[in-house]
Amino acid sequence: MNNHIEALSYYLGAFVDELTLLNVCDVVISPGSRSTPIALLMEQHEGMNTYLHVDERSAGFFALGIAKAKKRPVALLCTSGTAAANYYPAVCEAFHSRVPLIVLTADRPHELRDVGAPQAMNQINLYGTFVKQFTEMALPEASEAMYHYARLTTQRMIASACLAPQGPVHLNFPVREPLIPDFSLESLWDKGRGEYTGVVQQGNAVMPSEYVDSLVGRLSHMEKGLIICGDDSHSEIAAFATQLAEKTGYPILADPLSNIRSGHHDKTMVIDCYDTFLRNELLKETWKPDVLIRFGGMPVSKALTQFIKKQTKAVHIVVDESGQWRDPALVATEVVQASDIAFCSALIEKMPVMKKNDWFRMWQHINEKTKETLREMETYDTAFEGRVITDIVRVLPEGATLFASNSMPIRDTDSFFFTSDKNIQVMANRGVNGIDGIISTALGASMICDPLVLVIGDLSFYHDLNGLLAAKLHELNITIVVVNNDGGGIFSFLPQYEKKEHFESLFGTPIGLDYEHVVTMYGGSFSRVNGWEQFREEVQKGVTTEGLHVVEICTNRDENLTLHRTLWAKTQDVITTSLQGESK
């Protein structure tokens, strides 16, 4: 028995210690029995920060939020059985949004599998193709070879999670009883250290000089170009992309999640209203770029994606460090396996300065005309969902974070988050674009990003109410703006809206809940606003005071649809008139 406890303590102690040496210092733990030894060791290790979350589905997204904000791996620990299955949605999102999660699941030992033992199920490759790597850890043994194995396996798994494209990995730990480690053992954290501990160094892909010279030569003869920056771009992409734009004269179509629309950098070349003006048929038929250079994931804007797909005669250069490029439009003609920064740096160094021509001025002019028209909605007294975004940005302080939920909030952010000299970070879950786990992801991000404002619809808010517990347990500061249109507002913009007979029951799905009681239960403040002045006051109060603050603004789905369509129609008229004037 003592040999078992000694082996358990030293073996798992080496694993936990190696995590901290590899800078995995945050773990979200869901309570359970079989995971006891790992949980206790993590709690005891001075280099590890532990966060409790009792709901595994919310816990998975909470860890995802921390990892997104810190831009480094975060561990996630649960017991055996369906607890591990509840991590699945967060693992899927982490995989597709390229976020490194270290998923740790405790398991029954092999003799208790497939024999009807309680809380035992097949956890081998549980997450299938949604993790970059899976390993079934060996049972604890008291030997230097096994301590060495524990550390080296940890190194391999962390390296896999961090190698482009980043993503989740899964380690499954079979453990026998008894489960309580012995903390009186000498040198508990030192086993397997020293000569056995290695460090995985990851280099950057280098741009071949021959290709750079060739590309510079070609681009020098292509006056009509576009730089498209989507989600998952490098954190320093703004400075490099704007320099490249200045050299080439190509406008930057900046997705809000690229974080190029706001900040202290020069935004002369940044186009922010393309989602609206690329709906114009005359513009789409007459504006034909020679080359499109794309960084990061595909943009939120459907109009931009459709525009990209129509450019069948253009050169499409997709830059992706991993080589697993994202191209749902199926138009890529060249894929460059390099980091955004390496690509931009190589071109900036050798690219001659190309004068800003009529091509850039056309985009800039239409963008300004579109923005002028869209800003008219700031005079609307009605609770228009687009204005929710502009009014939040108006009161957000320097360095704040705006987290946009999926469905309508991220689309309104795309349409109405205009360029700003304030440094405002925009975040969202755009891996698989689900509405689950949004509250938890935002709360995880708020551990690092303060102040943070989450904009979320009422259905998405309902979907992750359990996530609010983290705000109470960990005393987090967050302001949540709930846009309550009593249902799935996005479906009003889709063809399903025309099927009136079944629309409300299948798509509108009103739930008629009063969220004030729930927010109060979790120790937060709740305010239901009436008017834009009160809305701005409540949001500002939220970002300047501690704790959980929920601000609810009620909108009407049909009225919101009409306002969007009216604004779009007016904008299209302005654009068409402007284009026809230019052609004369």
Swiss-Prot record:
Entry cofactor note text?
Binds 1 thiamine pyrophosphate per subunit.
Q: Which CDD domains match?
A: TPP_PYR_MenD (cd07037), TPP_SHCHC_synthase (cd02009)
Q: Which GO terms describe its molecular function?
A: 2-succinyl-5-enolpyruvyl-6-hydroxy-3-cyclohexene-1-carboxylic-acid synthase activity; magnesium ion binding; manganese ion binding; thiamine pyrophosphate binding
Pathway, according to UniProt?
Quinol/quinone metabolism; 1,4-dihydroxy-2-naphthoate biosynthesis; 1,4-dihydroxy-2-naphthoate from chorismate: step 2/7; Quinol/quinone metabolism; menaquinone biosynthesis
Q: Which InterPro entries match?
A: DHS-like_NAD/FAD-binding_dom, MenaQ_synth_MenD, MenD_middle, THDP-binding, Thiamin_PyroP_enz_TPP-bd_dom, TPP_enzyme_TPP-bd
**Substrates-to-products reaction catalysed:** isochorismate + 2-oxoglutarate + H(+) = 5-enolpyruvoyl-6-hydroxy-2-succinyl-cyclohex-3-ene-1-carboxylate + CO2
Q: Does the keyword Flavoprotein apply?
A: no
Q: Name one GO biological process term.
A: menaquinone biosynthetic process
Q: What class of enzyme is it?
A: transferase
Record flagged with keyword Manganese: yes
Name the job this protein performs: Catalyzes the thiamine diphosphate-dependent decarboxylation of 2-oxoglutarate and the subsequent addition of the resulting succinic semialdehyde-thiamine pyrophosphate anion to isochorismate to yield 2-succinyl-5-enolpyruvyl-6-hydroxy-3-cyclohexene-1-carboxylate (SEPHCHC).
Q: Which HAMAP family match?
A: MenD
Q: Which family does it belong to?
A: Belongs to the TPP enzyme family. MenD subfamily.
Q: Under what name is this protein listed?
A: 2-succinyl-5-enolpyruvyl-6-hydroxy-3-cyclohexene-1-carboxylate synthase
What is the native source organism of this protein? Bacillus anthracis
